[in-house]
Structure formats: C-alpha cells, structure tokens
C-alpha cells in the first residue's frame, strides 16, 4: 500500500495533469479571436445593395462609421458621402446613383435615333444658313486681296485669286465653287454626326510610345479602353474635392434670458438711469415705463431699468477654406494586374503606374461654411455682430461676441412686472435659414463631390506586337458570364485561359458582337464588359462555346454603370452601331424603318447635291477651256487678216 506521502504526491501530480489538459481545451476568448481576425484585415470597401439601401462592407474588418450608422460589425449604411474609419484610416465613398433597369436595346435605339435627329437639325440649320455661308465665303475670298496678288480672266475680265470656274462670274449665291464647298461641309457634318460614337469622341490619341485616352471622371463609372489590342478597364472609385479649413468662430444661439440687475424710479428715465448707476455702478441695458404700477408712484407711473444676460449654446463652427485639393481614385485592371491611380494634387504630373496630365486648379466661389458634426451649411456669415448676416453671436479667440440688444415688454398688470423677450439678439441663428449642402465635414476637412470632366491618361505601349507575335489563339479553359440581358448594367464576361510565356489573342463572339483582345504573358484571366439582348444566347471564345441563360434586369444586380467603348486610336469612328441596330426585334425594326423613310430623302439629297456640284464644276471648266481656245483662235485670225501690212 502507498504511504500517506506517496498518496499525496500522486494526487498532486494528477491534479496538475488535469489542470494542464483543461488549459489546453479552454476555448480562445472572443476578444482574442477578434484580434486575430482584425490583424488579417485588409480594408477594401465593397458596395452592394440591401433591399432599397446601399451598404459598404469591409470583409473581416471592424469599422467605425463617421457620418452614418452600422449595418453590422463589418458593414455600414451609405449616405450621399460616406466616411468610414478602418484600421485608423478614413475611407470616402459616394452613394451610387440608382441604375435603371430599363431596356438596353431601347436605350441604344433611342440613342441612335437622337443621332439621326441631330443630323436632321444640322441639315436644317445649314440649309437655312446657306445664303449666309455663301456670303461668308465671298467675304473670305475678297479678303485675300490683302495677302495675295489677284489675276484677271482674259475672257470676261473678272478678277480672281485661285481658280476661275464661272465665266462670266455670277452672283456669289450662284458660284459653283461656293456650292461645292458648302455641300462638302454639309455631307461631312451629317456623316460624323451619325457615325461618330458619343463615348468615343474624346477617347484615343497616339503620342509616340503612349496611347492617350480621355477618361470621363464620373464616380462608379466603369470604362473599357483598348491600347494596341490590350484591354484596360478604368473604374472611377472616388472623385471629390477636399477643402482644408480653418476655424473662424463658434456660432452660438441664446436660449435663456435672465435678469441680472433691476431698479425703478418715479422720476422718469433719467431718474431711473441715475439710480441704477448709483446702485450697481453700471449703465442699464433697458428702460421701460409701466402703464400701471400698482400705485408705486402717486403722480406718474414707475420707470423700470436694469441689465440682463443670455445663456448660449453652440450651434456650429464658422470655418473658412484655406486650401483645395482633388481626391481622385481610379482602379485600373488589365488581365490579372490591378493598379490604383491616386490624384491628390493640382498641377502635378504623375508618371507611375500611368502617365497622368496635371489637373487644372479649381477655383471655388464659396469659402465660408458652417459645420456642425458632419453636416455642412452655406450662407452669409457675420464677421461682426449684425442683423444682416447669420450668427451675430459667436466665440472667437476665447472671446465672446454678442449682439446685445435687450427687448422687454410691459405685462400691463398693476405692478412693476415686465417680460424679457431676449437680451442677446436671437434671430439669424436658425440652421433652417441656411442651405444644407451635400458636403461632409470631418477632422478639419470638408469633402465635396466633384466631377473633373475628362482626365488625360497615357497608357504605355507594351511592345509585344512586333511581327504579329501575339496572333496565335490562346487556349480557353472556362467562360463565365455574370449579369442580365437587355439591361443597363449589361454583363461581365470572365474568360480563363492557359498561362503562357508569350502573348496570344482572344476572340469572343456573341450575338452580332465580336471582341478581339491580346492577352498578356503569364496571365490566366481576362474580364470585359458587354451587352446581350437575348435571354438565351451562345458565346464562343476561341472555339469554346457556352450556352447562356441570362437573368432579367434587376435593380440590385450591379450598382455601377459601364460604357461600351471598344474602339482604338486607329479607329476614331465607331461603325459597330450599324450591326447592332440590325440585331434587334421586329418591333424596333419597324420603328426604325418608319424613321428611316422620313430621313432617307434628306440624307440622300446631300450627296446628290454634292455630286451635282462636282459635275457642274467639271462641265464649266470644260466650257471655260473651250471658250479660251476659241478666243485664242479668233485672236490669231484677227492678227492674220487685219494686222499691219508687211
């Protein structure tokens, strides 16, 4: 048997083992789990729809909303401009505009019809201005006499500077050369109005080893560009102005008014004034003669005078803008690579990762604002106490400034009571009298949404195309399509292919649309945007086919807008709309046919008149040449028969 000492030692050893095993099996506290997850957090905001609201989420990140409310621990509801703190950094997001679920094919059709209408308007305006244009041509032609020596026609004697078509020269409204120039201008105007793609007007310019694009600065707008066959997607994540501000004063509003000193006299205002100074050693703020005083005075009524003060509450800070700078974030995706362009200064060249031309300094009209919390108001603010501006009472440099104009009134009771309406002037302190802006204030900065128009971005040429090096087709492994048919959002097409040490070509076809892109070496995925008009359709990418059954349009599907630019610097005119116009249902075809019947006469008239002017021009030149030859022959005959005797 074990001794008592051995038993005690064995019991102690068992207890230690049990405690050690228990410690190993105790769950990690929730706070420790959160710390571990928070340490793995990468703050990347993701915007999505939840019912009728937009929310932004930071996966695996604990966030702190600044001007909105939490949706859950990692998501927050969105307002016009949403500020969220994640990992001690402030992220700015703008509420997306509601993407319409209208029919994309009808939208495209209406867009094409608007081009036709624009062409008709151009035709009518030029036709109405025809005589004025001829007069302008005549004035320009006449002005050449100051810079060019004129010539004289041997047949009709008229002066000319370049060419002489009409002989004799007619009125300027009937000149053949003016008609020809007019119809050339008219024809080219109609041609470019109809065929020039609205998304592609400002997009591409070639500059040596760069392809310059003009990016539309519109938040939550996704734009595709092709540079030397390679597809680039630019997504405008943020576009704001940031105002650095300085505090001018804290505007206050009087909310409670109290009597400080008071006295009365039967000797009128002067007597009351004298009594108050003698009693309190200060001048009274107000003087009131009672109508009834309860027989305080026998031969007159009492005069009351005294002082008062107001208790104030702060309603906001009057701030002034001292500096303005841009806040632009653009996400660029090409194949498996993602870059981010950050523009945070005006008049600054950016060379990496893309060449960015400087943005011109923005001049703002409003420099003074009132901020309270995250809200920003604008109006006319007081620099000194006045009734003609907002905030006559304020605190600046630890000094309280008030518009002290007490207002009291008689109670008309038989005593010396009176009512103090106010001591410090309370009006012009109501926030409802100011204009609430869509800006957001946080930490001595004001964030204001702003579109900078077109941003010039230079895409470096990759240099893979020498000798048709990229022409071989890449081997496609998988095709995925996300989105809806015949909707404003369109579809996102993701093609997975085999990685290679060299670049290759990817050709995808669906409906009447063909997408042709080069894929970079050592990449496996290419994403691009497109539109499909049918629910059931087939997409083919490098001989891999996939049947699609797309969903209907949904307002909750995608929150950003996309364009359909698929041109290049070498194709400034977009002719794809002609094919797409034919690939629509019979209802739209009938509608287009009716419009075309009305328009075709107008559009055919322009090339007809141009051709007529050219033929007339050539015919008159032949006539002039013939007349000149006959005149020379007649001159020779005259020299022979009526010349001087030999």
Swiss-Prot record:
Glycans are attached at residues 72, 80, 101, 247, 336. One of its GO terms (cellular component) is virion membrane. The keyword rRNA-binding does not apply. It comes from the Viruses. Glycoprotein G2 and glycoprotein G1 interact with each other and are present at the surface of the virion. They are able to attach the virion to a cell receptor and to promote fusion of membranes after endocytosis of the virion. This is Envelope glycoprotein. The lineage of its organism: Viruses, Riboviria, Orthornavirae, Negarnaviricota, Polyploviricotina. Residues 141-176, 610-646 are cytoplasmic. Specific enzymatic cleavages in vivo yield mature proteins including glycoprotein G1 and glycoprotein G2. Glycosylated. Glycosylation is essential for proper subcellular location. It comes from European mountain ash ringspot-associated virus (isolate Sorbus aucuparia) (EMARAV).
